[in-house]
Amino acid sequence: MNAMKCLEILREIKDVAFATVDENGKSQIRIIDVMIVEKEKLYFCTARGKEFYQQLIHNGQVAVTAMNLAFQMIRLSGRAEKLSEQKKWIDRIFEENPSMNQVYPGDSRYVLEAFCIADGE
């Protein structure tokens, strides 16, 4: 299975386990939505006030795993990169994931920051 197919499976699953490293070097894990997959990159977002955001900014090392209904398990590790053109990416995330409008209506969406994993393994 090639890298793009693995990323597409993660997008189909959508809710994936996402691990980071905290300021004490300990692993932390939570469920995060895969928002966009294209050009062998996985895109996601989080709010600036969350510990997850701080961990991404401080260290950036992440690991993602999920299993679909066919029992295909996908693992991805790499470095998360904060994207430039934040407004453009957040708007695109909301276009492709309209249910986000219920959680973050109107301009409240701009509390979020978009990231990608570009060179994962």
What is the predicted role of each segment?
Residues 21-23, 47-49, 67-69, 77-81:
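Histidine- and/or cysteine-centered catalytic micro-motif in compact active-site loops
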Residues 35-71:
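A short mixed-secondary-structure module that forms the rim of ligand-binding clefts
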Residues 34-35, 87:
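A generic structural motif
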Residues 1-4, 49, 98:
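Charged, amphipathic alpha-helical segments
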Residues 8-23, 62-66:
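A short, Trp-centered hydrophobic/proline-enriched beta-strand micro-motif
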Residues 12-16, 30, 38-40, 58-62, ...:
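A generic structural signal for short beta-strands and their flanking turns/coil linkers
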Residues 75-121:
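Charged, gly/pro-rich active-site loop segments
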